[in-house]
Amino acid sequence: MNANPCEVCRFQNKQCVNNCMFALLFPSSDLEKFDVVNRIFGLETLTFYLKDLSPMERIDTTRTLYYEAKPCFLNPPKNPSKFLEALLNYPYQKAEEVSKTKKLLASYSRPCVVLALPAPKYTQSKSKPSVLRKRKRKTKSSDESAIRVVEDS
């Protein structure tokens, strides 16, 4: 039996035994730590999280739970209307963010300079000159003996 019971045993009005799981985690000198974690998570949840862990993992887990619970404890949400108000203002906040980003990008961009380059000159291939050839093709018409000259390109 310990002379100074841990905060968990003191909260439960129990006598703290030598192998108490919470003795190292919540000593009697640190009341605030247990109070914050207990109010946010509760004792049953805390016990559930810590029961299967090694002593070193328990210390890390307790520290993490405390750091997660402290902001909620210090700044509790007053009512659900604050949350709804934040959700309703979300699109407007994003629109403002986009406009600010566009202005910032515009301040970084340089004016675009277009150089007038001469038009490319197209040359003909020297191996096969393109010459229009005329050939005769027969077409069907009222006069079957008519021959028509067609230009191929």
UniProtKB/Swiss-Prot annotation:
One Pfam family this sequence matches: LOB
UniProt-annotated stretches for the region Disordered: 126-153
Domain of life: Eukaryota
Classification via InterPro entries: LOB (IPR004883)
Record-annotated LOB domain positions: 4-105
Sequence similarity: Belongs to the LOB domain-containing protein family.
Protein name listed in UniProt: LOB domain-containing protein 26
Gene: LBD26
